[in-house]
Amino acid sequence: MREELKGIFASVFGEKEGLRFFFAPGRVNLIGEHTDYNGGHVFPCALTMGTYAAVAERNDGLVRMYSDNFRNAGIKECSLDDIRYQKEDDWANYPKGVIYEFQQRGYAVPHGFDIVFSGNIPNGAGLSSSASIELLMGVVLQSYFHPEVDALELVKMAQHAENHFIGVNCGIMDQFAIGMGKKHHAMLLNCDTLDYEYSKLNVSGLALVIANTNKKRTLADSSYNTRRQECNDALLDLKKGLDIAALGDIKPSDFDAHSSLIQNETNRRRAKHAVYENHRAIKTAHMFKENNIDEIGQLMKESHLSLKDDYEVTCPELDELVFAAWDHEGVIGSRMTGAGFGGCTISIVKDEFVDDFIQKVGDRYQEKTGLRADFYVADIGEGARELKGE
């Protein structure tokens, strides 16, 4: 990848000495969807696919950025003394937001740089290409200027940038999984306390297969922020009878006993999903430790149905992919992953059935929707970092 990045960099900015190389992964969430901003648990892992960068220092205050994934957009430029969100900068607002966040927290960025990005995360697939770019930019600034900033602070800064600079009310899961990822491990993360534990995925004989619906979706334009508000409204109702700070504080049995406090029926269903999905995420992490694969498959099924019926963030394309997967003999479990409204599914498939799964599920999906799905056999990798000798 280094040689490829060098070539792109030279063609865009000319050849420069002292190039440094960085990588930030994408992420996939095995279970625990739309729980992160509800103070619940998630169970994500970092992928080996992600975003790469080649960086050269400048001796002025100019930052020049180019993405090989958005070639037609050309070079995006900004000055370090005037970092602002500009709609026409599109993808470049994500790294700009992280630069701005460093500056706002008193971490000086003394000079600019030229940077080339190149990613192999499908854009809009729900595998967190945006958070990948944010953490990548964070690691660049950390490595060049502020080694005292630890990984957890980088994660928080990237999330804050997306919330306040980009204007997407995301939880912390994406940035956390990408910043703190560990090879061959998922992490059970409490999104309220940020307590976490790594869980080695004993998936011998099994493969994680990501399927991209290729249904166009953009998170900021979807109903994401609406769902967040509905959950907040439900929480306010529940607080009238329960001493809780977040939906993630409630056990399913307590929710069932007090759900009538929630006046609005739609909000009640949203909250039910958040409470039960939090329980499913915790249980799934335990099931991986016990190697209880069949129970994991059942929990994934329950998760998808809850996202479909109670949270209403699936779509016909996601449902078709998941239903086709459930009908395949080699599948342990399958569900939508990510924010929904399009994007990807994650399936646990027996190794010997992977090729047949991709063929048959892909054919059935195309027949039902007219769209061709893309499939990726996922490898679980390390978090965002500078590539030194890799």
UniProtKB/Swiss-Prot annotation:
GO process annotations (BP): galactose metabolic process
Pathway: Carbohydrate metabolism; galactose metabolism
Main location group: cytoplasm
Localization of this protein: Cytoplasm
EC number per UniProt: 2.7.1.6
Keywords: ATP-binding, Carbohydrate metabolism, Cytoplasm, Galactose metabolism, Kinase, Magnesium, Metal-binding, Nucleotide-binding, Transferase
Active site (UniProt): D174
Molecular-function GO terms, alphabetical: ATP binding; galactokinase activity; magnesium ion binding
Any one annotated GO CC term: cytosol
Binding site for ATP: S67, G124, A125, G126, L127, S128, S129, S130
Reaction(s) catalysed by this chain's protein: alpha-D-galactose + ATP = alpha-D-galactose 1-phosphate + ADP + H(+)
Annotated positions for site Transition state stabilizer: R27
Binding-site list for substrate: E33, H34, T35, D36, Y224
InterPro entries in alphabetical order: Galactokinase, Galactokinase_bac, Galactokinase_CS, GalKase_N, GHMP_kinase_C_dom, GHMP_kinase_C_sf, GHMP_kinase_N_dom, GHMP_knse_ATP-bd_CS
Keyword Signal belongs to the record: no
Positions annotated to bind Mg(2+): S130, E162
Function: Catalyzes the transfer of the gamma-phosphate of ATP to D-galactose to form alpha-D-galactose-1-phosphate (Gal-1-P).
Family listed: Belongs to the GHMP kinase family. GalK subfamily.
Name under which the protein is recorded: Galactokinase
Annotated source species: Bacillus subtilis (strain 168)
Gene designation per UniProt: galK
